[in-house]
Amino acid sequence: MAKQNFVRSKPHINVGAIGHVDHGKTTLTAALTMYGAKKHGGKVMNYDDIDNAPEEKERGITINTRHVEYESAARHYAHVDCPGHADYVKNMITGAAQMDGAILLVAADSGPEPQTREHILLAKQVGVANLVIFLNKMDLADPELVELVEMEVRDLLNLYGFDGEKTPFIRGSAFAAMSKPDDPAATKCLDELLDTMDKYFVIPERALDKPFLMPIEDVFSISGRGTVVTGAIAQGKVKVGDTVEIVGIKPTQTTVVTGVEMFNKLLDAGQAGDNIGALLRGIEKNQVERGQVLAAPKSITPHTNFKATIYCLSKEEGGRHNPFFSGYRPQFYFRTTDVTGTVTLPEGKQMVMPGDNTELVVELITPMDKGSRFA
């Protein structure tokens, strides 16, 4: 059967669900796709469709980020379901780095947990502009304690640089909304959530006029067709027939885009902000990997050495407990990958304490492109 074309009838925005493990992120994601499909059309994704890796099903948690789509009255949403488990923080960073806004889930019956704090901090660090808070599991919560939970979350938002007083809070039960899609009382919270997202999440200005650039998040081999790379386009546009380069980590390769899709629908052209899959001519799956970028020819040059001005987060800000010295080899998170680098401090600087500002030189073990943000 021929694939449908993707029709741009509404503004597109990238959002996602973050928060502590088992606070209901995947359940809410499934509920939103069901509700959006019922009201505005689209594909229903149930819980098992989203939690679809064997290890995830076995452990009942989300490991890699999952992309789904749904619509509100005003917008088309690409939604990433982020893992909450502590072992998978770098996957959470991969998802959060693509978000224009995020839904932070907090279970009303238990309140903020360790990963709640961590995800708020990470969202701030990777540049998520705004959060909407969904107080979940209201059907299990003590009504007298819910106000205290909300106050505690607002304090956390203020602590990590968000506006705790102005951030919207929605109360509901994602499980009830998913289980009773025809019950207006159960789905009222989804109506409120989508309406709030439409009003509160600002669609950023997309860099459409810059050279095409897309960090590669995943790589697939499709029998009979070739290799597909997926990711969110950071800037520019791409269409079938465009020549592109695969840059970073390995020697640069040149290829041609032979197909562009978004959510299994054909795209005339992918543009900044779109989550796409690009089919590449003559590239084997083992020749490309997550962490590389797809880019317009000659538009970027990878580097292994750079100078940076940094602030070292203190223990209270979710950062280091101890100082570090020249020769320290941390992980640098760039877009969709992490790269080890060796730190050299300026002459006369013996060490960097938590809370310090300093300049330093970094030598990466694999090259990255100039201007890349890192955490």
UniProtKB/Swiss-Prot annotation:
Domain tr-type G, first and last residues per copy: 10-205
Annotated residues for binding of GTP: 19-26, 81-85, 136-139
This protein's name: Elongation factor Tu
Start and end residues of each stretch annotated as G4: 136-139
Region (G1): 19-26
Organism field: Spirochaeta aurantia
Molecular function GO terms recorded: GTP binding; GTPase activity; translation elongation factor activity
Primary location recorded for the protein, binned into one broad class: cytoplasm
